[in-house]
């Protein structure tokens, strides 16, 4: 069974983990009601998507 020849240093470990992070979600303003919403998703406030009402309130 293969084992590491040398111990991985703190710096080497942290440099490897710099890419393992959470991203900020892409928020845009709804053109219909002006609320902030996730892009490419139905607006939770007014229920519209691409100018059409998808969810009736």
Curated annotation (Swiss-Prot):
GO CC aspect terms:
large ribosomal subunit
Q: Which keywords annotate this record?
A: Ribonucleoprotein, Ribosomal protein
Q: Biological process (GO) annotations?
A: translation
Q: Does the keyword Ribonucleoprotein apply?
A: yes
| Domain of life per record | Bacteria
Question: What GO molecular function annotations does the UniProt record carry, in alphabetical order?
Answer: structural constituent of ribosome
Q: Which NCBIfam families match?
A: rpmF_bact
Q: Which family does it belong to?
A: Belongs to the bacterial ribosomal protein bL32 family.
**Protein name, please?**
Large ribosomal subunit protein bL32
Q: What is the species of this protein? A: Exiguobacterium sibiricum (strain DSM 17290 / CCUG 55495 / CIP 109462 / JCM 13490 / 255-15)
What gene, per UniProt, encodes this protein?
Answer: rpmF
């Amino acid at each position: 069974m293969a084992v590491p020849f040398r111990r991985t240093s703190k710096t080497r470990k942290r440099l490897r983990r710099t890419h393992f992070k959470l991203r900020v979600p892409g928020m845009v303003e709804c053109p219909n009601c002006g609320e902030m919403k996730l892009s490419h998703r139905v607006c939770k406030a007014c229920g519209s998507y691409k100018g059409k009402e998808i969810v009736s309130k």
